[in-house]
Curated annotation (Swiss-Prot):
Gene responsible for this protein: skat-1
A GO term for molecular function: L-amino acid transmembrane transporter activity
One of the GO biological process terms: amino acid transmembrane transport
Transmembrane annotation, as ranges: 64-84, 132-152, 172-192, 194-214, 236-256, 270-290, 316-336, 362-382, 383-403, 426-446
Alphabetically ordered keywords of this record: Amino-acid transport, Membrane, Transmembrane, Transmembrane helix, Transport
InterPro entries per UniProt: AA_transpt_TM
Function statement: Plays a role in the accumulation of vital dyes and endogenous fluorescent compounds in lysosome related organelles. Has an effect on lysosome related organelle (LRO) function, in a pathway with serotonin.
Tissues in which the protein is found: Expressed in the head, tail, body and ventral nerve cord neurons, muscles of the vulva, and intestine.
Any one of the GO CC terms: vacuolar membrane
Protein's name in the database: Probable amino acid transporter skat-1
Membership in a protein family: Belongs to the amino acid/polyamine transporter 2 family.
PANTHER family with a match to the protein in the record: AMINO ACID TRANSPORTER, AMINO ACID TRANSPORTER SKAT-1-RELATED
Chief localization: membrane
Subcellular compartments: Membrane; Cytoplasmic granule
Length: 460
């Protein structure tokens, strides 16, 4: 073999080894510039996307599931979410590198998975898969934003409802309408740097409000020895749905990773994802445990309404309403990030004389109004939260990531892993997907039952 042929073969082998990459040894990507954020701000933004209205319904979720069943399930759900988020980012980074893209959002990632697949059916229907993923994420984000409106409305009614007439349902609609104006204002900003600043300010309000709630909660007589360890199937499934919703940052994973100045910091051992998951799991477990053991069967659908309305405690509602107001723009950012470019291209081609700023703001106003209508149609936190969490939440956390990972690395695993290692990975992913399918089927059934029961009862 000549020296030139030897060099060519060395380059070919090196290229093959690089292409067969299951994500364990990604080449250090170049630093990004422009509208980017640091790892610290990424942790704050991702934590804020999880620390939201759903957290304060966790004590109520523990009541539905039972004390010790809920305690165990909290760690199981956290672990499943962490696993799904980790393999999602790993596969996304791999495909972004493979397709010479700096980053991929969830929908285009799903399309790339199918485009590079060995399965002809997936290659021929890659756009359909992308649309399905996008619609799922759209429903998830809109559900989260409608929950934020409900949370604000619920706390406003808790503060001033005694001075208003009408039923609680009418009061909730009135307060949702009042909050709509302020939510529209916070959704007029487009850059991740501004959105992450909102997340920072929102986190301050959240920490203050959560600290006051925890301080009041731990002062209550502890009832842990009197509470049931488990309840029933329906209650447990509803608890799982509400806990899945509490980890509502699944759809923010890729948008934040895409804006990180150093992408390698996201999956590092003490990087953005692991740090965020540890913080969130510890806080959510503590809030659920102490909230339920402190108030017992009297715990409300959101623990903020168990706190007194006078003195320092009355400010808790205000702080948490402000954090939900600012946090709403974080959740809606995903919708704008995924759909606006396509909308602007098609809308601009059909209506070229409409100013770009008008189409931009009109697009944002439209989706905010959709979340408002969702909140008005189902103005009950205890129904909306598990409904969103157990459907779109389970799809985004438990079904899409393992499915896409297997398709992405299927060929690479054959060349890099032993048969036993490959079968172990496939088995783990299939188990996670089976859990997700079961959660969706059981969750939809229990939530439909809860909706029928709720609306068949007279409104107080």
């Amino acid at each position: 073999m000549s020296e030139e042929e030897g060099r060519e073969r060395a380059v070919t082998v090196e290229g093959d080894a690089e292409s067969m990459n299951d994500g364990r040894a990604l080449v250090q990507p170049p630093a990004r510039s422009g509208d980017v954020i640091t790892p610290t701000r990424a942790v704050l933004t991702l934590s804020k996307s999880m620390f939201n209205a759903g957290c304060f319904s966790l004590p109520y979720a523990w009541k539905l599931g039972g004390l010790w069943v809920s305690f165990v399930m909290s760690f199981v759900i956290a672990g499943l979410n962490w696993y799904g988020n980790h393999i999602l980012v790993r596969a996304s980074q791999h495909l972004a590198k493979k397709s010479d893209r700096s980053a991929l959002d969830y929908g285009h990632f799903a399309k790339k998975v199918c485009d590079y697949s060995d399965i002809r059916f997936l290659r021929n229907n890659s756009k359909a898969v992308m649309y399905f993923v996008n619609v799922t994420i759209l429903f998830y984000q809109l559900g989260m934003c409608s929950v934020a409106i409900l949370f604000i409305s619920d706390n406003l009614v808790n503060l001033v409802g005694d001075h208003l007439g009408g039923t609680r349902h009418q009061q909730m609609i009135l307060m949702a309408t009042v909050s709509l104006f302020f939510i529209l204002l916070t959704n007029m900003f487009t850059e991740m740097r501004i959105v992450s600043f909102f997340a920072l300010v929102s986190s301050v309000f959240f920490v203050i409000g959560a600290a006051v709630i925890m301080q009041y909660t731990v002062q209550q007589p502890n009832q842990w020895d009197k509470l049931p360890a488990a309840t029933n199937f329906t209650g447990t499934i509803t608890m799982i749905g509400m806990s899945m919703y509490a980890f509502e940052g699944q759809t923010m994973i890729l948008p934040i990773e895409n804006k990180l100045d150093n992408p390698a910091a996201f999956l590092a051992p003490f990087g953005v994802l692991s740090t965020t998951m540890i913080i969130c799991t510890a806080f959510m477990t503590a809030l659920g445990f102490f909230g339920y053991t402190g108030f017992g069967d009297s715990i409300a659908p959101t623990i903020t309404t168990n706190v007194p309305k006078e003195g320092l405690y009355s400010t808790v509602n205000v702080f948490l309403m402000l954090q939900s107001l600012l946090g709403n723009s974080i959740a809606m950012y995903v919708v704008y990030d995924m759909f606006f470019n396509g909308f602007r291209r098609k809308f601009g081609a059909r209506f070229p004389n409409v100013p770009k700023w008008l189409s931009d703001k009109g697009f944002r106003v439209f989706w905010v109004l959709v979340t408002y209508l969702m909140a008005v149609l189902i103005p009950k936190l205890e129904i909306m939260i598990p409904l969103v969490g157990v459907t779109s939440g389970a799809l985004c956390a438990l079904i899409f990531p393992p499915f896409f990972e297997m398709i992405t690395f299927w060929t690479d695993w054959k060349g890099l892993l032993t048969y036993r290692q490959r079968m172990t990975k496939i088995f783990i992913n299939l188990v996670v997907m089976a859990i997700g399918v079961f959660a969706i089927i059981a969750g939809v059934y229990t939530n439909i039952h809860a909706i029928i029961q709720s609306f068949s009862q007279p409104d107080p």
